[in-house]
Amino acid sequence: MKRTKRIRALCAELAPCVTFADVGCDHGYCTQYMLEGNLCRSAVVSDISAGSLSKAETLLSAYIAGGRVTPVCCAGLDKIPQDTEQVLIAGMGGEEIMTILREGFLPPALVLQPMRHTPKVRAFLLERGYAIVRDFTFRDGKFYDVLRAEFPWYRGAQPRGYTERDLEFGYDNLRSPSPDFLELLQEEMRKCRARLAAAQTSVPAVEARLNRITEVYDDLTRSV
């Protein structure tokens, strides 16, 4: 099966571990990657939708039969073993991801791909003692943010000092900007300008956002 750029980007952030869980697994491609590469001993795939979970069950049927994968239909982390070492949560809103973690448990390692509210997710992780070791944006049709976070005691991850700008735009994006991230900034500037052009009055919040994005873009393109 040919994995999409999005799936490949997520897989690239998954580290070897003993136990792995894919929450909101959809087709189960990331779990397949972990198992095919012998990157985990066992895995749990979960989804709140039995229909979506069945896709992963079909893809991973041989591993399920062999006892290496356990499929569970549940909300969030409800039926995920609390000793799970690494958890992937991708394709959900940032608020939903934070709710799942608040109501569940905090695993040693997380790979997250929030669809919205990524700055809030960054702050949430830092407040709970995680070191965010990867934080970048890529494009696969849409723009996606990916975060890899670990507790420092897990594998010796070193916390990185986050500024307000890092929280808003992403630590790695600001230090090693990809063409995809620069495209995102250009697109966001166009959207802000279009909103301001269509507005009948001043929109201070949009003007302030445009100024922040423009400043970041100018800083990054001067240094590229």
For each predicted feature, which ranges?
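S-adenosyl-L-methionine
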Residues: 54-82
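An accessory alpha-helical subdomain
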Residues: 152-224
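Conserved alpha-helix/loop element of class I SAM-dependent methyltransferases that forms part
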Residues: 2-17
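C-terminal substrate-binding/active-site "lid" region of AdoMet-derived donor-dependent transferases
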Residues: 102-150
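Glycine-rich SAM-binding Motif I of class I
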Residues: 28, 32
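Conserved SAM/SAH-binding beta-strand->alpha-helix loop
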Residues: 49-50
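Conserved class I S-adenosyl-L-methionine
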Residues: 17-26
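Conserved S-adenosyl-L-methionine
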Residues: 36-42
